[in-house]
Amino acid sequence: MIHKLATLTLFLSFFNILFGHCQVPCGVYGDSARFTQMLEDQSTIAKAIGQISELTGKEDAQSANQLSRWVATKEDHASKIQKIIAEYFLTQRIKSSSDKYDALLKGAHAVMVAAMKCKQGVDVKNADSLKSAIESFQSVYEK
């Protein structure tokens, strides 16, 4: 029994390290770092969309390989943004007692939807909308 409990504790500790801000809660927060990271992820998404457009239609193996890698990169960075919103802001930083609660929820939702749209297509307008949503959310959050 103790062995199973120790194994479970170790697994959960490892899982927590891999998948999100600690959720202890540790009280160590870096809001500006999270916004910087989301904007960096958005820039990567925008670059990926451009590269996907450039590589589409090419038939050589290298282009096919690069195309699939850029698609995966776009998906990954959009998911990272959604994870930051869900696991950092929504669960730890946005409080229902805040006067800005509704505006913050709307802003967080807009970021998550914009990231989802980036996953669904390759229109650079979606990447631009994502950047605007992040900046708008940051503006409300930092007021």
List PLM regions with ranges.
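Secondary-structure edge/capping motif, primarily at the C-terminal ends of alpha-helices
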Residues: I49-S63, Q92, A115-K125, Y141
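Short, solvent-exposed, charged loop/turn and helix-capping segments
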Residues: I81-Y101
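Sec/Tat signal peptide C-region and signal peptidase I cleavage site
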Residues: F15-H21
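Sec-dependent N-terminal signal peptides
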Residues: L5-F14
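Alpha-helical segments in soluble extracytoplasmic regions
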Residues: I49-Y88
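Short, charged, amphipathic alpha-helical segments
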Residues: N65-A72, Y101-L105, A127-A133
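Immediate post-signal-peptide N-terminus of mature secreted/exported proteins
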Residues: H21-A61
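C-terminal amphipathic alpha-helix
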Residues: F35, H109-K143
